Regions:
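General small-molecule cofactor/ligand-binding pocket signal
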Residues: 36-38, 87-91, 142, 191-193, ...
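Glycine/small-residue-rich hydrophobic helix-like segments
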Residues: 204-263
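A short acidic, glycine-rich active-site loop
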Residues: 56-70, 164, 211-223
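A short helix-to-beta-strand connector/capping loop
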Residues: 79-87, 234-240
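Charged docking surfaces used in two-component/phosphorelay signaling
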Residues: 90-99, 243-251
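Gly/Ser-rich helix-loop-strand patches that form or flank binding pockets
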Residues: 3-5, 23-26, 30, 99-151, ...
Length: 310
């Protein structure tokens, strides 16, 4: 995946963050990219109590800040090596705003973080921070499912070739490029899904007629995907193509579950080229139900609604 040059890893100090850390190190090393560890902590309420330190009396907030900065710098030094120099930065405040501020001022082109939940039947994988970043971060965001890292992974690319706007086609191209790069990088397998909209059922139309319409819609979907894939050489990957009909978000999740997907690569806006803060219904539905890591990309021209002074 030779496209990232300045990667930001939102550091998770617990063991569950190891997988995201490993992915960030891999990407930075392969891309000869810069890598920065960022940890954001909430400020402590002021108590007025002072504590004795070697250089004088300090309040609890200052002591905590020093400890976080020191431990993060040590972690960055441990991860550095073989030509990779890892930087570190500790910030204090609202996690979402501080991450967005760092992306803006640091000109990062990829953010990695560990999903807040553990996934599975009883728990959503993506929490408030993940969702906010997926909606509003101007660069690609990779939210990593906290699970044991595998040497080989299965990657699912979700595309929509029915969109004819140039920025939509570029978005699909980016999704396919990233997904195929990941599959090759980790000796994995590539699946591609396009969900087509079925003809609506109606009591006034015979079911055989509806079935004929759906057969024609499926054929058209096959042709669109074939034409799109003609621009790529995936012969080494032998991707499996999925063309389910129905509600887009749920069909993507069903394919991901059936194929035991590790990473879903998808665009996050319903209308490419749209500027603003809202993800499309498809992306929202996927994030509510998916139990895999998600690498989300924005279309060209996307502008984050969160602004900072230069």
């Amino acid at each position: 995946m030779q496209r990232f040059s300045n990667i930001l890893l939102v550091h998770e100090g617990r063991p569950r963050g190891r997988k995201a850390c490993d992915r960030a190190i891999d990407l930075a090393s392969r891309n000869k990219a810069r890598l920065k560890l960022l940890e954001v902590a909430e400020p402590l309420p002021s108590s007025g109590v002072k504590y004795q330190a070697p250089d004088g009396e300090l309040d609890l907030q200052t002591l905590v800040e020093r400890e976080i900065v020191t431990k993060l710098a040590q972690k960055a030094e441990e991860l550095s090596g073989d030509g990779l120099v890892v930087e570190s930065k500790a910030l204090f405040g609202d996690a979402f705003l501080e991450i967005m501020r760092e992306v803006h001022h640091g000109q990062h082109d990829l953010v990695l973080l560990t999903a807040e939940g553990d996934g599975g039947i009883k728990e959503h994988l993506f929490g408030s921070l993940s969702r906010h970043l997926l909606r509003k971060c101007p660069c690609p965001v990779w939210v990593v499912r906290p699970a044991r890292r595998k040497k080989s992974i299965r990657v699912l690319a979700a595309v929509n070739p029915t969109e004819t706007h140039p920025s939509a086609r570029n978005l699909d191209r980016t999704v396919l490029e990233m997904a195929s790069s990941l599959a090759r990088m980790y000796s994995g397998q590539l699946d591609i899904v396009h969900v087509w909209q079925q003809a609506p059922r109606s009591g006034r139309v015979h079911r055989n007629v509806v079935a004929k319409w759906n057969a024609e819609l499926l054929l058209a979907a096959e042709q669109r995907v074939t034409e799109m894939l003609d621009h790529f050489d995936f012969s080494d990957l032998g991707p499996r193509i999925h063309l389910p009909g129905g509600p887009t978000g749920m069909r993507i999740v069903e394919v991901a579950e059936e194929r035991k997907v590790d990473v879903l690569v998808m665009g996050t806006l319903s209308r490419s080229g749209l500027q603003g803060m809202f993800m499309g219904n498809t992306a929202e539905s996927v994030l509510q139900h998916i139990d895999a890591s998600v690498l989300a990309v924005k279309p060209e021209g996307f502008e984050s609604p969160v602004k900072f002074d230069s």
